[in-house]
Amino acid sequence: MKIAYAGFDLLYPCLEALERAGCTVERVFTYPTDNVYEFNRQVVSFAEKRGIPWTDRRITSQDLQRLWEGGCQALFSAGYLYRIPVDTPLRCVNVHPALLPVGRGPWPMPCTILRGLTESGVTLHKVAAGFDTGDILLQEAFPVTQRDTLETLTETIRTVAPRLAAACAAGLDRLWASAVPQGAGEYWPEPGEEEMVITPEDSARRADRVARAFAGYGFVYRGGGEEQRILRGEVRFASHTTRPGTMRVEGGVPMYALRGGWLRIFQWA
């Protein structure tokens, strides 16, 4: 099957899986990235090594029409930033890292942890006019534990999503015809800066969720009139009488007292 692909490196394994499933990739779409928190190097390298045309500008209706006229049968989107036009006969599939219809939005992984959910998943759905609202083609749920972080959740998604993408490509005609409408759902805005902040007055439970939700991306500890950016840390739950905000070092690890625990700093940003 001839396809086009849109995305960046977070879900790059989907692109490889589609090729292994027998798809011929006709064109690759990505978007400009900072190559600090977001990358497109793997996607671009995939295209260049195979001589596949690629672009980092927005997909247009004209792009999709040309693909359709050239015999392309589908476009698969996995983490693509821009809105994909829907005025096209080309079947457009989006890979979304949440168990829709709950978790619509640009960055559902940290939201899953911040909300204390015990389940998430990956959903493949038709691209529709509303973000993440299209009929569901395939989805798979997986458990989320109290030890999961943004990094472990992302790795689970990077394992599940390619398998679903390959299965969708193999059975696209059948899945497209039997897709299930989502109905009412829940949209999660991208977390704001204040949601990434831990203060000495926070409960250990809230601090734990923040530290796990932004592990590897970074969060902020705000105390004593200063802000410190932390890349990785963890919260140790413990009863104590130490004043919140007090810092000590244990085994070479800096720790800040919280209400009901300690914030341990493993890596500064």
Give residue ranges: language-model regions:
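One-carbon transfer enzymes
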Residues: M1-R222, M247-A269
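A conserved acidic, glycine/proline-rich C-terminal tail/linker
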Residues: E234-E250
